[in-house]
């Protein structure tokens, strides 16, 4: 007699118009097991799990819970079958306590404040969450908010938990704590599904790995019988080199210097406190920190988008007689002050600065425009005369489609119709094509599949070797440690340390992300 699976998907198909997101997928989820769900962007991972959690209905196929066919039309139906999903973007009311958020929408005396707090405490003690039921959400760290989301689905009786990119904004220490909690739930007989791009986490945590490719089910393997290389080949269908290079540029001239920078947000609260560092052409300077530590504000201040209360940002242009071919003249010592200048004024004084913001469509691109018009946003003011050059940006758009493998019906298709990963490729490609001397990019591979991610790493290294100063805000510490020459760590809007990329460890950077002080500040260079 075959074992009964907690959840079994049979021949599941889901279409959105002419696009087949899931094509006849079969998948089994078992109790007491952690299953990682892998696949490139657009492979259908989240769509498949959204059908389990009641957000979508399958067009074809059936879902079995404990061997019996079920219909899941809503998240309420999903909970009735013991299925709970923790999404990447948390759905909590900031002014409510943990207990109030967990009980939100539930009726009856058994869900009054005192009863909920007691049950939340019991769940917390059982799995080691360490949650305070009476703590307000706005006082919580990112990992605490995630904990509340997990407890919320457990409180509603979930036996099958689905987590979408659960470690995206966690420190290494918080990630290990989450893994210990998931292992405890697995030991208690829960079935757990993890959607992730991080292969090292797949290998460290999961029992089995299921792989999707272009909406089709490729197979499920035991984690102990595979490795990152094999999993990557299953995802993309061909061999892929997973090495991240760290080439060394011949020259490293001072390109950017930040001194005592202080900034406030729109509510008048300090977001950057006495920030000082240097960035050099021919290096990649990583910027690490938990979410909300000031990464976004720092890049925006340098770009002229965030007003500075005090401090200085000096730009040092390459010597005009230097060239990529190898002729090098040391940088002029007189720096150009950027504080107080708008982005337009920064451009007018000759600062060649490219910025890939975190908010792609809100700040970086115009969603209603096609690729050609979005390319022109960077250059249309440079065209002399009344007529705007469209041939050059069209040629650039076609070149980027080819080089970055951007999936789009055409260069005139509004970019908002593209997948998130393809939108990122458009923005990164445009900024790199502007031949900057300073390239700032925030989370350039967020949402990208592994093939596209390694393409972006290669492009960043190419800019570095052209003596561009690259500032890279990232969330994957493994990548930052492999790719960056130095890593600046922010904590609470302050520089908690600047470490050497080749010699630093995840644990060292993780501690600096949560503690100000103890790191090596300043700009000591060999």
Where are these regions (language model features)?
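Glycine-rich phosphate-binding loops of nucleotide-dependent enzymes
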Residues: 2-526
């Amino acid at each position: 007699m075959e074992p009964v699976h907690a959840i079994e998907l049979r021949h599941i198909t889901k279409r959105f118009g002419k696009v087949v997101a899931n094509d006849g997928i079969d998948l089994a989820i078992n109790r007491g097991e952690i299953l990682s769900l892998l696949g490139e962007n657009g492979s259908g991972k989240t769509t498949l799990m959204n059908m389990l959690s009641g957000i979508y209905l399958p067009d074809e196929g059936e879902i079995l819970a404990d061997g019996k066919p079920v219909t899941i039309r809503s998240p309420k139906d999903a909970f009735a079958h013991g299925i709970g999903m923790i999404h990447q973007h948390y759905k909590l009311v900031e002014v409510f306590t943990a207990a109030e958020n967990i009980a939100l929408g539930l009726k009856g005396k058994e869900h009054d404040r005192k009863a909920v707090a007691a049950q939340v405490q019991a769940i917390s003690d059982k799995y080691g969450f360490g949650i305070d039921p009476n703590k307000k959400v706005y006082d919580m760290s990112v990992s605490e908010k995630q904990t509340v989301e997990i407890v919320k689905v457990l409180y509603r009786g979930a036996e099958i938990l689905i987590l979408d990119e659960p470690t995206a904004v966690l420190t290494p220490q918080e990630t290990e704590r989450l893994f210990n909690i998931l292992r405890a739930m697995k030991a208690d007989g829960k079935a757990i599904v993890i959607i992730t791009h991080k292969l090292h986490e797949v290998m460290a945590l999961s029992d089995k790995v299921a792989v999707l490719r272009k909406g089709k089910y490729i197979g499920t393997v035991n984690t102990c019988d595979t490795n990152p290389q094999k999993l990557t080949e299953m995802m993309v269908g061909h061999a892929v080199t997973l090495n991240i290079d760290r080439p060394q540029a011949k020259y490293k001239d001072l390109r950017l210097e930040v001194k005592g920078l202080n900034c406030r947000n729109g509510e008048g609260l300090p977001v950057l406190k006495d920030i000082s560092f240097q960035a050099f052409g021919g290096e990649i300077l990583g910027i690490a920190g938990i979410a909300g530590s000031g990464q976004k504000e720092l890049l925006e201040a340098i770009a002229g988008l965030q007003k500075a209360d005090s401090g200085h940002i000096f730009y040092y242009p390459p010597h005009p007689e230097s060239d990529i071919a190898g002729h090098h003249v040391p940088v002029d010592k007189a720096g150009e002050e950027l504080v107080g200048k708008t982005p337009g004024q920064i451009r007018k004084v000759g600062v060649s600065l490219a910025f890939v913001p975190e908010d792609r469509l809100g700040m970086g691109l115009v969603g209603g425009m096609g690729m050609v018009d979005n390319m022109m946003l960077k250059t249309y003011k440079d065209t002399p005369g009344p007529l705007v050059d469209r041939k050059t940006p069209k040629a650039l758009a076609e070149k980027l489609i080819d080089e970055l493998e951007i999936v789009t019906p055409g260069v005139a298709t509004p970019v908002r119709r593209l997948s998130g990963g393809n939108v990122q490729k458009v923005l990164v490609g445009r900024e790199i094509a502007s031949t900057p001397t300073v390239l700032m990019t925030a989370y350039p591979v967020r949402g990208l599949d592994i093939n596209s991610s390694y393409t972006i790493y290669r492009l960043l290294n190419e800019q570095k070797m052209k003596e561009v100063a690259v500032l890279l805000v990232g969330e994957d510490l493994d990548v930052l440690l492999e790719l960056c020459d130095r890593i600046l760590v922010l904590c609470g809007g302050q520089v908690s340390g600047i470490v050497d990329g080749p010699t630093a460890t995840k644990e060292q950077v993780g501690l600096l992300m949560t503690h100000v002080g103890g790191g090596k500040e300043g700009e000591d260079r060999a």
